[in-house]
Every structure is written in structure tokens, then in C-alpha cells.
Curated annotation (Swiss-Prot):
PANTHER family: UPF0502 PROTEIN YCEH (PTHR38768:SF1)
Pfam families: DUF480
InterPro entries according to UniProt: DUF480, WH-like_DNA-bd_sf, WH_DNA-bd_sf
Name of this chain's protein: UPF0502 protein Rfer_1648
Source organism of the structure: Albidiferax ferrireducens (strain ATCC BAA-621 / DSM 15236 / T118)
Family listed: Belongs to the UPF0502 family.
Database matches in HAMAP family: UPF0502 (MF_01584)
Length: 228
């Protein structure tokens, strides 16, 4: 396990593109370790992929290169040595000063936007296996209560949306977030009550199905399908 540093200055404020680049490096380090560190072209493809991304982006090579330069200056990304092709790897845990579990949650929030603790536990299956939702909530609360001496809070719990039972969490790596917003994104905000309830029930059933697929894949010794 990487031992994080404890920065005495506030965490750097990222642009959405920088957050996408950093989150993609963090994801690929865990999900495709044989291809990591990443070349610029592979990183670009990961940033623009259509699955497991919210919002979808259409970045150019110049966009990614500029973001990498800024992230290198902030000591959050570094170039990998020992290869004829320039490759890049993240230095998130040491640069921000968090442990692996917290880094996983922040990475998913950067890539997929606000999510409930249950959604985060499900979506992090390929990154890190949390024991239960309570453990996810525990790490999120630690990130929310992070002291100023360590760089300040890194997540915020958003207001509950209409027709929903659970609150969503958002990261603060791109600056302050209005905690009164629901953070529902593509979900049920603004829908009639019955429709919102049906959508929430379907989302819950989908989460259960995904968990069942994960277990079956583990028993069969095969890789789970890419989530969308």
C-alpha cells in the first residue's frame, strides 16, 4: 500500500479535463495493469470512451497533453521511464495525501460524476472490493471531514433529489460544489412521483443484477463485462 503524504496546502483545483485525464490514469492502473503506464494515444482513447464516463467528452490530443503538463507541475502525474515511447502514470495518492480506498472513490467520482454510496460500491468492483456500503460511507465521511491541515474536504454530500431515498456524493477536486443541488444528472429529478419511483426501483434492480453477474464471473473465473 502506498503511504500518502500529508499536504499542508489546499488540494489543487482541477479543470474538468484535468480531472478526466487523472481519473482515467487511475482507472487504467487498476483495470488494465498490463498496459499501464499509458501512452498519450491510449490515454486519449480512455478519456473519450463512451462507457463509464459522465459526462462524455471529445478531447483532442492537444487537450490531453496540456492537462498532463499541468498535472505534472502539480506532482499528480509523472512520465514513466524505461520505454522508448513516452508513457504517463498518476501520483494521486501521494500528491493529494489519501489512502487507496479514498483514492478509488475520488477516481470514480471524477470519471462518473455524483453517485450514491451504493452506486460507488458497485462501480468500484474492478478497482477495489469494499466489504459493504457502510465501509464506502465511512471513507466518504472521512474525506468530507478532512481537516484544513491535510488540504481540506475532498467530497460533499448533495441534497436528496425528488423521489429518491439516497443522497449522492460529489468530489471537490474541481472546486466548490453547491451542496443543495441534487446531483441527479441523468436520473429522476423533475419526473412525476410515480415515474421517479419506478425509475429508482429499476435502478435498484439493475444494481442487484450487476452484483449477481459479478459473483457469477468470479465463480467462473472470467472477467466481468464493461459497465455502461
Amino acid at each position: 500500500m502506498i503511504t500518502p503524504l500529508a499536504p499542508s496546502t489546499p488540494s489543487p483545483v482541477l479543470t474538468p479535463i484535468e480531472a478526466r485525464v487523472l481519473g482515467t490514469l487511475m482507472e487504467k492502473a487498476r483495470t488494465v495493469p498490463d498496459s499501464y503506464p499509458l501512452t498519450l494515444n491510449t490515454l486519449l482513447l480512455g478519456c473519450n470512451q463512451k462507457s463509464s464516463r459522465e459526462p462524455l467528452m471529445e478531447l483532442t490530443e492537444a487537450d490531453v497533453a496540456a492537462a498532463l503538463n499541468t498535472l505534472k507541475e502539480a506532482h499528480l502525474v509523472r512520465e514513466s521511464s524505461g520505454s522508448r515511447t513516452t508513457r504517463f502514470e498518476h501520483n494521486f495518492q501521494r500528491g493529494i495525501g489519501v489512502y487507496e480506498q479514498a483514492a478509488v472513490l475520488l477516481g470514480l467520482l471524477m470519471l462518473r460524476g455524483p453517485q450514491t454510496a451504493g452506486e460507488l460500491r458497485l462501480n468500484t468492483e474492478r478497482w477495489y472490493k469494499f466489504a459493504d456500503i457502510s465501509s464506502v460511507e465511512g471513507f466518504l465521511e472521512e474525506l468530507q471531514d478532512r481537516s484544513a491541515e491535510k488540504g481540506g474536504p475532498l467530497v460533499v454530500k448533495l441534497a436528496r433529489g425528488p423521489g429518491t431515498r439516497e443522497q449522492r456524493w460529489a468530489h471537490l477536486l474541481c472546486g466548490p460544489v453547491d451542496a443543495t443541488q441534487t446531483g441527479l444528472g441523468r436520473s429522476s429529478e423533475g419526473l412525476p412521483g410515480n415515474t421517479a419511483e419506478r425509475l429508482e426501483r429499476l435502478e435498484s434492480e439493475l444494481a442487484n443484477l450487476r452484483e449477481t453477474v459479478q459473483k457469477l464471473c468470479a465463480e467462473l473465473g472470467v472477467s466481468p463485462p464493461e459497465q455502461v
